[in-house]
Regions:
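Short, basic/polar N-terminal leader/transit segment immediately after the initiator methionine
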Residues: 1-6, 14
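Compact beta-sheet-dominated domain cores in extracellular/mature segments
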Residues: 4-7, 20-171
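Cleavable N-terminal signal peptides
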Residues: 11-15, 22
Length: 171
């Protein structure tokens, strides 16, 4: 192989490494969203609602194992968490998960997404009961929102079709 080809491959390799590093340093984004019935709540960068389990206090992680099939932790990744307008950096933190990953907390609450929320404005995890506790949306002030979810299906973009006494079966 000629020196010209080797230089080309070296440049490509360095470029690929640079792109990989750019993707690796992305940080989660948290922002504020106004949702009917709930007020101003914390959402992720895609506008999806984030939740807190009632049994998880002071950064203590209880949702692990099969719980993670339903609730997806908001992980810190690399770099500083990006906060949108209306959120307080003083309330932002992290806690260590059992696997060593850092999970984002807001006002001490470890944050999760619910597997049934697929569009901004949905809050189908609100009031769900399971072995990890009862799940609540987190307000931008750092408090849990206890407003119950609708008890009948809305077919739209908000609420839950099973109400606030849903139990997630299987773990």
């Amino acid at each position: 192989m000629g020196s010209r080809a080797l230089r080309f491959l070296a440049v490509c390799a360095v470029g690929a490494i640079g792109v990989g590093v750019a993707f690796a340093v992305t940080a989660p984004i948290l922002k504020s969203s106004k949702v009917a019935r709930l007020g101003s709540i914390v959402v992720n960068g895609k506008g999806l609602t984030v939740y807190h389990a009632s049994s998880e206090k002071n950064g203590k992680v209880v949702c692990k194992g099969n719980c993670l099939y339903f609730w997806f932790p908001v992980l810190a990744g690399k770099g500083k968490v990006v906060l949108g307008k209306g959120l307080s950096r003083a309330k932002l933190g992290t806690t260590k998960r059992p696997n060593g990953a850092l999970q984002v907390t807001y006002n001490g609450f470890p944050l999760y997404r619910y597997y049934r929320d697929s569009k901004p404005g949905q809050f189908r995890g609100q009031g769900v009961k399971d072995p990890a506790g009862k799940w609540y949306v987190v307000s931008t002030s750092g408090k849990v929102v206890t407003t119950p979810a609708p008890t009948t299906g809305t077919g739209g973009t908000t609420g839950t079709s099973t109400g606030s006494t849903t139990t997630v079966i299987g773990y």
